[in-house]
């Protein structure tokens, strides 16, 4: 998998309430969640984000409540992946489980600016900043997690495995 997009940059400790405010948790519609993605971190984000744009954040992205709505909102907003210095553990697992690729790469976060265009090779964990020409390598996810992401999430992964008789 490869993604190319414009960067939206966020700071440290962006919690799940900033990603998708609690006032919208009465819906499970990905399309509705996307309309409010990141609005407490940047109120104009839902109107400005475009399909393919990439979120880059500092450390501890996705901390706070253990809501699966947060990575669902990001994915439904058309953001194909998130790059951060680190992720809260529960967000990390929820992102994998819904098929949202995430990459931990402190060097990339420090070197990428909002508005830069980056290309991410998800299979190799290579992040190329097309604006500056810099290349970074993210921590590789275990093969099992990569398989879940490539399947589109844990549910689809399990359905496929069952259908294959595995």
Swiss-Prot record:
One of its GO terms (molecular function) is 3-isopropylmalate dehydratase activity. Keywords: Amino-acid biosynthesis, Branched-chain amino acid biosynthesis, Leucine biosynthesis, Lyase. It catalyses: (2R,3S)-3-isopropylmalate = (2S)-2-isopropylmalate. Coiled coil: none annotated. Gene3D superfamilies: Aconitase, domain 4. Its EC number is 4.2.1.33. It is an enzyme of class 4 (lyase). The keyword Cell inner membrane does not apply. Signal peptide: none annotated. One of its GO terms (biological process) is L-leucine biosynthetic process. Pathway: Amino-acid biosynthesis; L-leucine biosynthesis; L-leucine from 3-methyl-2-oxobutanoate: step 2/4. It comes from the Bacteria. InterPro entries: Aconitase/3IPM_dehydase_swvl (IPR015928), AconitaseA/IPMdHydase_ssu_swvl (IPR000573), IPMI_Swivel (IPR033940), LeuD (IPR050075), LeuD/DmdB_bac (IPR011824), LeuD_type2/HacB/DmdB (IPR011827). Catalyzes the isomerization between 2-isopropylmalate and 3-isopropylmalate, via the formation of 2-isopropylmaleate. Heterodimer of LeuC and LeuD. HAMAP family: LeuD_type2. Belongs to the LeuD family. LeuD type 2 subfamily. This is 3-isopropylmalate dehydratase small subunit.
